[in-house]
Amino acid sequence: MTRRAICFDLDGTLVDSLPDIIGGFRSAIAEQGLPVPGADEVRPWIGRPLLDMFAALAPEGDAEVLSAAYKRIYPQRFTQHTRPFDETVHVLEELRSRGYLLAVTTTKHSPMARDLVTALGLADLLDHVQGTDGFPAKPAPDVIERALSALDAEGTWMVGDTTHDVHAGAAAGLRTYAVCRPEATHDRATLASAHPDRLEESLLPLLDLV
């Protein structure tokens, strides 16, 4: 029997982590004495590689130095406000009960992603946590392909909250499910422009599709 897997982005999809990510990003910039962008300026960049984010939002600084500062600051606060979304545990438990393998496919590096899902009590509900470790980030499909290879499974859906997730899922040959929450990284119009197979306001409707 073919093993079936569903891939999930982490931040903004399974967990409400944007305040801690934005706070860490702004703190890293402030620490270097640079002009600090507002939260609304940072939000659309979440899910992109750190070097790209810092180059765009703190062009006066050294992106390598700022990235190193973020990697030091963020783990100290990454569960200060971060919590799973209300439906996350229920949806993951239900999908596992239906025989699906569940993977996180995130732009975070794998060790940080594993630390976060463990701290939030989600590790036992996930079969694999795949970060972006030295290969092209989403919208490239590499992180999804590596997760599916590790699971030796056929991918069915890619679930995420950004256009990068949608494009990566489509490039990997998966159906795509975009989540547009009130404080989403990308707004509904932006997500719709990527043409996901489904565009919903939470994870719950996914249960009617599998």
Region spans (language model):
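Short, acidic loop-to-helix structural element flanking the phosphoryl-transfer center
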Residues: Q76-V104, S110-R114, P141
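Metal-dependent phosphoesterase signature
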Residues: A55-H90
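Active-site neighborhood of HAD-like aspartate-dependent phosphohydrolases
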Residues: M1-P44, A56
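Short acidic-hydrophobic, aromatic-tinged amphipathic segments that line or gate anion-handling sites
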Residues: R198-S202
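Helix-loop "lid/cap" segments that line or gate small-molecule binding pockets
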Residues: A28-I29, R48-G61, L116, A147-A150
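Conserved Lys-Pro-Asp/Glu-containing loop-to-beta segment of HAD-superfamily phosphomonoesterases
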Residues: A5, K138-V166
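Conserved phosphate-coupling serine/threonine residues in phosphotransfer and NTP-handling enzymes
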Residues: T13, T106-K108, C180
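Acidic, Mg2+-coordinating phosphoryl-transfer loop and its flanking beta/alpha structural elements
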Residues: M158-D197
